């Protein structure tokens, strides 16, 4: 199997603090680049854990369609600004950030006060504009999670009336593109592939760390497949039908046939279903007439038994 390597050939940090990394992975056998590219892209875009603002409390506001006196933006605009805030929480617990600002002021993300567990990535992101003589008091809830978590309206009845929930986007990777270069040729003349991946993150994680974390998740996913355990399937006994549970007495057999069967420990139709016609003839004092009688009784309830043991 080919030993390939991964090289980061470019790294950029944009004005909004998002980061772009370009990686080359190769040489790879034909088809492996597509396998790697698709697998990594799926995990990068939806499987990495990230941080997001999940709720906002604004002093004096109890619903999202309100306005805040002395603040240029309405509540919906403030919530949108908070939702787009890029944060990185190192805590698995709920973290709360607060700010109290008196106008005139341009409130930005840097004005929020969090614990040392939370880093604000885009500190210059605007939150609101407060006019002179007015103030704004905010509380932001930050949590860690995976993927996208919409507001659960079912829980609103148990949530504080002034806590405005936000659809949370926990995905730290914003974009993943990959292309496959098939021009690299080995010494033996066989065509090899090289995977080129472009990864853009929101700045809460570097592209290098994102690739490493995605690769580790894939390793954990596939590792159990390296040791396949053989499990013998135990055949399950079929559930007895209603007819099979009919007691022998309800077949209305003659006294002779009934007594012979009882002495042979036959107590129900289920027991009879284990017999063939030849088996019935071997029961002591059980002749062909009695055997025919049993066959007819079983056929009346839709059950038949084989003529011989070999056809059973």
Curated annotation (Swiss-Prot):
Keywords: DNA-directed RNA polymerase, Nucleotidyltransferase, Transcription, Transferase. GO terms for cellular component: cytoplasm; DNA-directed RNA polymerase complex. The lineage of its organism: Bacteria, Bacillati, Cyanobacteriota, Cyanophyceae, Synechococcales. DNA-dependent RNA polymerase catalyzes the transcription of DNA into RNA using the four ribonucleoside triphosphates as substrates. It comes from Prochlorococcus marinus (strain SARG / CCMP1375 / SS120). It catalyses: RNA(n) + a ribonucleoside 5'-triphosphate = RNA(n+1) + diphosphate. Residues 246-312 are annotated as: Alpha C-terminal domain (alpha-CTD). The N-terminal domain is essential for RNAP assembly and basal transcription, whereas the C-terminal domain is involved in interaction with transcriptional regulators and with upstream promoter elements. Signal peptide: none annotated. Its EC number is 2.7.7.6. This is DNA-directed RNA polymerase subunit alpha.
């Amino acid at each position: 199997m080919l030993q390939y390597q991964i090289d980061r050939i470019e790294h950029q940090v944009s004005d909004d603090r998002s980061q772009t990394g370009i990686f080359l992975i190769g040489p790879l056998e034909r088809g492996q680049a597509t396998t790697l590219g698709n697998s990594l892209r799926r995990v990068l875009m939806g499987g990495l854990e990230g941080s997001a603002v999940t709720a906002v409390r604004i002093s004096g506001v109890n619903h999202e369609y309100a306005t805040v006196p002395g603040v240029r933006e309405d509540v919906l605009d403030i919530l949108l600004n908070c939702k787009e805030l890029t944060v990185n929480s190192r805590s698995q617990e709920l973290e709360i950030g607060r700010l109290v600002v008196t106008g005139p002021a341009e409130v930005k993300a840097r004005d929020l006060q969090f614990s040392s567990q939370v880093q604000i990535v885009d500190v210059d992101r605007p939150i609101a504009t407060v006019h002179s003589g007015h103030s704004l008091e905010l509380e932001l809830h930050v949590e860690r999670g995976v993927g996208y978590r919409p507001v659960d309206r079912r829980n609103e009845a148990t949530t504080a009336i002034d806590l405005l929930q936000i659809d949370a986007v926990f995905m730290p990777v914003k974009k993943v593109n990959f292309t496959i270069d098939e021009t690299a040729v080995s010494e033996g003349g066989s065509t090899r592939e090289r995977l080129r991946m472009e990864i853009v993150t929101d700045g809460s994680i570097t592209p290098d760390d994102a690739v490493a974390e995605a690769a580790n998740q894939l390793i954990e996913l596939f590792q159990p497949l390296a040791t396949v355990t053989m499990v013998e399937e135990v055949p399950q006994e079929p559930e007895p039908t209603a007819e099979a549970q009919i007691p022998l007495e309800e077949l209305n057999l003659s006294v002779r046939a009934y007594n012979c069967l009882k002495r042979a420990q036959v107590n129900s139709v289920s027991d009879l279903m284990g017999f063939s016609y030849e088996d019935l003839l071997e029961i002591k004092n059980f002749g062909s007439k009695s055997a025919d009688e049993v066959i007819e009784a079983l056929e009346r309830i839709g059950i038949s038994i084989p003529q011989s043991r070999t056809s059973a």
